[in-house]
Every structure is written in structure tokens, then in C-alpha cells.
Amino acid sequence: MQKERNINSNKVIYILLLIVIALIALLQFSGENDNKFVTASEKAITSVVTIYTSNNTNTLRSQYSNSKNIGSGVIISDEGHIVTNSHLLIPNGKILIGHTNGEMSEGVMVGQDNDSDIAVIKTDVAFKMLPIEVGNSSEVRIGDQVLAIGNPYNIGLSVTSGIISATGRDYGNPYLELIQTDAAINPGNSGGALIN
């Protein structure tokens, strides 16, 4: 009877020990992922800007308050080149860029491709711009965890998370090879960063 009780006690101890080890491993893995997301967000968010466009030719401040389109953009060079979506731009319109340091600057369109909905704009500023580290979209896999950074509803830069749901989406347009994600993307996020 005593021997049977010792065996049962040992089983309970082993099971509890396994549960504790599993929980520690799970918490450590979760913490590593959380830290990776935090580090990636902090690194990338300084490279994301807000894009305001208008056909208004008045001052920067009135242009900001009369903006027709609001979206996001990503700094891709320290010379002030920013990539965004071309649907945000108004033909012959003004472009205003809101930076993470609170500064505003004017931008000019360098080029755009409406078929792929991509535009490059340039701005000149007195402060150092931090370009994002550009990845290789051909290495993205379905199920990869990603972060979307942008300015939804013009409430300020935000980070949302999700996974890659699909790759190579073209929606009937042979120019496109879109990446689909389930990360929350709302009006104002257009042109923002999708990072992994």
C-alpha cells in the first residue's frame, strides 16, 4: 500500500514537473515573439509618415486642414524618397508629409504607376530621415506573422498584427502580385508599412 502511494505520488510530481516545464517554455517563446514585435515596431515606425494630399494651393497649415486624401508612406532613402500608394495623390495637387518627430514638409511626386498603385514622392527636410530596411517579398510565406504600420483615420501612427493570408494575389490585374494579410488595415493605412 505504501509502495503504491509512493508510485502515485511520484507520478503526480512528474506530471506537475512536466506542466511547469511546458509553461516555462511557452512563456519564454511568447516573450521572444513579443520582444521581436516590439523591436520591429520601434525600428520601423520612425520610417513611416503620414501623407496629406489636396488640390488646395494655400499654406501648409490650411492644406493640412483641407486635405482630401490622408494615407501613409514609408521612407526608403535618407535623401527623402518616400513610397506610398498612387491612389492617395491628386493630379497637380499638393502633398504634405507629417513626420514622426511632429515636423511637416512639402513633397513632390517623383513618379507613379497607377496600374500597380505605387508612387514615389520626395521631400527635403533639415533633419535626418531614417529609411526602412526593405525586405524581399518573394521570401514571404503564408502564415508568417506581420505588423502593419500606418495612420488609420488620421488618429496617429498605429501598429496592428496579423499573418500573411495569401501571396501573389492579382485581382485580374497582371501588374499586381499582392500580399494579403488579416492585420487590421483601415482608411489612412494605405501606403504604410507591412513588416515581418
Locate predicted features.
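N-terminal Lys/Arg-rich, disordered targeting/topogenic segments
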Residues: 1-9
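Hydrophobic membrane-insertion alpha-helices, especially the h-region
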Residues: 14-26
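Serine-dependent protease modules
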Residues: 26-196
